[in-house]
Each structure stands twice: as structure tokens, then as C-alpha cells.
């Protein structure tokens, strides 16, 4: 069975005063999107896990433990972890934790929680974009 991990920031830890976030965004809207993501992954027949983390070292530890527990085919990183400019360093920690903990998994990015399954589908099965390595060029 296809295994997908959706990693994002815990909705209750988001700084909604950050002007780089969409206006009107709140924890309830994010959670509703996460719930849709979980349902959509299940509807596609995937075994989808959700890992919402705090933007600190404890979050990285939780992510590392999750990655160590299962072999994932794809890990989708949510926009809340990568879009706010002030979160760049933490986003780099997330990417490196995924690279170390799931080196064979594809990494995908959603634009909002609701399109998490679409992001993963770009890299799973027949929907996978081909990647040319330098040895194939």
C-alpha cells in the first residue's frame, strides 16, 4: 500500500499576525483543510499519516520519530512550514530531517492543506514526473 506523510505546522502554533499569511486564515480553517487532506488520501487508497509539529526542536524530534517508524513513499510538506519568510531556517530543518529519515521518499509541496493528496499524486505511481539524473544526461 502507498504510504504518504503530510507534515505541517500545528494550527495552534501559527502566528496569524504574520503579514505573509493569507488574510482571514485561522486555526479552524487550517484544521478543516488537514481533515480534508486525511480523507482525500484515504479515498485514494493510500495509508496517509498526519504529523503536525511545533516550529521548534521538539517538532523536528517528533518528525524524526515519525519518519523512523514507517517507510514512506512520499512526504508532503505543508505551506505553513515553508511560506512565511521568518520560518526559512525551520523549513530547512524539516527538509533535512525528511532527507535523512526518509531518503527514498519523494518530497512534495502543497499549496493548501486541501490539495495535499494532489501534491503527493504528482510523485506516486503513474502520476510521477520523470527525473533525469546527471548520469543519464
Regions found by a protein language model. Name each.
Residues 1-21:
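N-terminal, charge-rich interaction modules
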Amino acid at each position: 500500500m502507498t504510504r504518504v506523510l503530510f507534515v505541517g505546522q500545528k494550527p495552534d502554533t501559527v502566528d496569524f499576525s504574520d503579514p505573509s499569511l493569507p488574510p482571514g486564515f485561522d486555526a479552524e480553517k487550517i484544521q478543516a483543510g488537514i481533515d480534508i487532506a486525511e480523507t482525500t488520501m484515504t479515498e485514494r487508497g493510500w495509508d496517509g499519516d498526519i504529523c503536525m509539529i511545533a516550529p521548534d526542536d521538539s517538532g523536528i524530534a517528533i518528525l524524526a520519530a515519525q519518519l523512523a517508524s514507517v517507510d514512506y513513499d512520499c512526504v508532503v510538506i505543508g505551506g505553513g512550514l515553508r511560506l512565511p519568510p521568518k520560518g526559512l531556517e525551520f523549513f530547512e530543518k524539516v527538509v533535512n530531517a525528511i532527507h535523512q529519515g526518509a531518503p527514498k521518499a519523494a518530497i512534495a509541496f502543497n499549496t493548501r492543506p486541501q490539495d495535499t493528496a494532489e501534491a503527493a499524486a504528482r510523485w506516486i505511481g503513474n502520476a510521477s514526473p520523470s527525473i533525469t539524473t546527471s548520469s543519464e544526461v
